[in-house]
């Protein structure tokens, strides 16, 4: 799908998370690495994409913000930050002897088990379950990510973004989310 611009150059009408996609937005746009010191009090926050910073700070953002919408198309593997279970597994004699056995497959199983124990709602669990067949798996660490996503003021939006206007984000399912600030992860 494309539209013609004035100078006959075709531009994709699909949201690509590039700087041009945010030109109409009048609010503030933050990079995910600017989250630590920012005050989100009484703001409608949109998080576009997922990285270690957004996973780590989502609970803090939810505590301060009026409403948080997390736009995430592809779910990732979330491991507990405390890693008590992982430490026990690593010190097991069979794993300690053959360190190479502790690879992405084992971490994937641990991440899926963590998801299973942390998320109660079946549909949300399905939306957050990553594809275990993917060859390049991304692992993030957080003890509170799943808890934050289940808060009353937080919504996981898995439909693709259609456009960003001056005060809102529209997704493909027709939902309009009013937004005061956008946290953008770099693709």
Question: Which role fits each region the language model picked out?
Answer:
Residues 26-29, 168-170, 174-187:
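Extended hydrophobic/aromatic segments used for targeting, binding, or gating
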Residues 1-12, 137-138, 145-155, 163-164:
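Feature captures the FAD/FMN-dependent oxidoreductase FAD-binding
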Residues 1-5, 39-41, 172-181:
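Core beta-strand elements of the Rossmann-like FAD/NAD(P) dinucleotide-binding domain
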């Amino acid at each position: 799908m494309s539209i013609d611009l004035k100078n006959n150059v075709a531009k994709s009408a699909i949201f690509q998370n590039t700087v041009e996609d945010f030109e109409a937005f009048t609010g503030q746009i933050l990079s995910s690495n600017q989250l630590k010191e920012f005050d989100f009090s009484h703001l409608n926050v949109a998080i576009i994409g997922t990285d270690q910073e957004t996973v780590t700070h989502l609970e803090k953002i939810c505590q301060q913000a009026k409403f948080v919408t997390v736009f995430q198309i592809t779910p990732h593997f979330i491991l507990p930050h405390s890693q008590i279970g992982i430490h026990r597994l690593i010190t097991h004699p069979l794993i300690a002897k053959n360190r190479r056995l502790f690879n992405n497959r084992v971490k994937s199983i641990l991440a899926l088990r963590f998801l299973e124990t942390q998320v109660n709602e079946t549909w949300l669990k399905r939306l957050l379950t990553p594809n275990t067949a993917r060859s390049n798996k991304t692992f993030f660490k957080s003890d509170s990510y799943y808890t934050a996503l289940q808060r009353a003021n937080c919504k996981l939006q898995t439909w693709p973004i259609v456009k960003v206007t001056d005060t809102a984000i529209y997704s493909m399912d027709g939902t309009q989310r009013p937004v005061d600030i956008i946290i953008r992860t770099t693709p």
